[in-house]
Amino acid sequence: MADLVSGEASESDEELQEKNKIFAAEISGEASEEDDEDIYEQGRSSNQVNSTASIYRNNLLQRKLIENNIAIWRSLTAFTRSFVLSASKQLVTTDQMLIKSQHSLQSAHTSLQQAQKNAQDLQNRVADVITSNFLPHISIQKAT
């Protein structure tokens, strides 16, 4: 029990376990009261010492457990918060990249549709040119 708690008096194991023995003469034929009282006092004092020590230990144990639980909770909360923040930053970055990619794909799709329309128009004009007569039909009569 070497731990000291601030605000409480220091106790040593020796102070709690020291007993002062008093020696007295016994009268023969009389029952010794000392033995009975000692047994009662021993039980009472050891119970008091044990209960005081157990209260002190339990109190100290409770404090240490609460402090450790708070420390664990804080570190777990900090870890979770940092993990969530870094994951959310990565998600935001990925989302921005996806938006840029989507915009690029939409622009490419629009450009491809315009190119397809232009190619179709060109094909129609080429077909018109090939099928039409450039020169009018000239009929030449033979002179006889």
Swiss-Prot record:
Entry keyword Cytoplasm: no
Coiled-coil spans in chain: 102-133
Keyword Transmembrane helix belongs to the record: no
InterPro entries named in the record: BLOC-1_complex_su-3
Compositionally biased intervals (Acidic residues): 31-40
Disulphide bridges: none
One GO cellular component, as annotated: BLOC-1 complex
Pfam families: BLOC1S3
Keywords carried by this UniProt record: Coiled coil
Residue segments, region Disordered: 1-48
Record-stated family: Belongs to the BLOC1S3 family.
Protein role: Component of the biogenesis of lysosome-related organelles complex-1 (BLOC-1) involved in pigment granule biogenesis.
Record's subunit section: Component of the biogenesis of lysosome-related organelles complex-1 (BLOC-1) composed of Blos1, Blos2, Blos3, Blos4, Dysb, Muted, Pldn and Snapin.
Protein name, as recorded: Biogenesis of lysosome-related organelles complex 1 subunit 3
Organism whose genome encodes this protein: Drosophila melanogaster
Lineage of producing organism: Eukaryota, Metazoa, Ecdysozoa, Arthropoda, Hexapoda
Protein encoded by which gene: Blos3
